[in-house]
């Protein structure tokens, strides 16, 4: 399926149409949601976190060891699998680095206004939280990345309520060109049997979510999808997870920033945030009864350089 086939939800540029497609079909690939200049500016710092593809594919064992050692790897929960066929393999989940990053530019990209605006538009609500924030890097040859079709039911402790006001939006922002031979996510099209939602993917066309850097793949947890293998020699693929839920939806979650908010990467990030950006992580907005003059003073001490004017003005 071509990335230009907008009738399938791949490569849409009109945000209203893209939001409607997500609401009706559960997924959409928004082409160029973030300008490539913004992506490229941030990706200059990506190689402080990951080996450059040229370096990685030079077959230096020390470089591969660095990649493995710096990854937040969830693959331990999956059993070993045979080399052939679609399966969840431990090494598929190498390459995760959790937010906040040591890169200020990538941290700012995590809350890019175009992404948060689209999430609000698609979800149909303004008060949202970012609950999954990480980068995922893959390189050809690390493992067989071919997965079976699956749904992401591990974002919720109760069954998903797939209705306006209740649904969450999962998303991948493309940091690199995600072409057909570097593992674009595959989506199972066709109407799902909502009476038996976990029985398997629907019969219908399969869509490859190939797209350019700056594109954003948004999907819901009921969508059947899978990872595919990287087949390009010397290939790589980098995505930024940016997933959102309604404020107050404590039953949904994935990544938690509170334990790292005393570290330098978060402090630097938070000091540059607007109230609305901090609210994506649960911080009370100006005017919330949580705030007192003393707490606003403490906010300035905790995040040197933050513009606390909105919080202070709201106390007046």
Where are these regions (language model features)?
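Active-site rim elements
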Residues: 102-108, 204-207, 227-228
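Non-heme Fe(II)/2-oxoglutarate
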Residues: 3, 52, 56, 223-224, ...
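Non-heme Fe(II)-dependent double-stranded beta-helix
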Residues: 2-24, 31-149, 155
């Amino acid at each position: 399926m071509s990335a230009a086939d907008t009738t399938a939800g791949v490569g849409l540029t009109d945000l209203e149409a893209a939001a409607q497609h997500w609401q009706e079909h559960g997924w959409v690939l928004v082409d160029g949601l973030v300008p490539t200049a913004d992506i490229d500016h941030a990706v200059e710092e990506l190689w402080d976190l990951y080996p450059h593809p040229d370096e990685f594919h030079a077959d230096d064992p020390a470089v591969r060891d660095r990649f493995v050692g710096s990854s937040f790897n969830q693959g331990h929960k999956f059993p070993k699998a045979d080399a052939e066929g679609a399966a969840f393999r431990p090494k598929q989940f190498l390459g995760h680095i959790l937010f906040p990053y040591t890169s200020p530019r990538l941290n700012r990209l995590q809350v890019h206004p175009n992404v948060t605006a689209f999430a609000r538009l698609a979800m149909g609500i303004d008060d949202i939280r970012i609950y999954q924030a990480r980068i995922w890097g893959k390189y050809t040859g690390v493992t067989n990345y071919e997965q079976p079709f699956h749904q992401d039911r591990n974002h919720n402790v109760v069954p998903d309520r797939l209705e306006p006001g209740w649904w969450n939006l999962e998303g991948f922002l493309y940091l690199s060109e995600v072409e057909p031979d570097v593992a674009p996510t595959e989506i199972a099209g066709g109407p799902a049997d909502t009476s038996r939602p976990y029985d398997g993917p629907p019969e219908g066309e399969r869509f490859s979510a190939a797209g350019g850097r700056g594109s954003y793949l948004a999907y819901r947890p009921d969508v059947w999808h899978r990872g595919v293998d990287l087949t390009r020699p010397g290939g790589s693929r980098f995505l930024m997870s940016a997933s959102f839920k309604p404020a107050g939806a404590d039953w949904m979650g994935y990544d938690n920033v509170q334990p790292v908010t005393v570290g330098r990467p978060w402090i630097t990030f938070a000091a540059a945030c607007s109230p609305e950006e901090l609210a994506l992580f649960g911080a009370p907005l100006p005017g919330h009864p949580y705030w007192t003059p003393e707490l606003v003073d403490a906010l300035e001490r905790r995040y040197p350089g933050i513009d606390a004017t909105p919080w202070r003005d709201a106390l007046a």
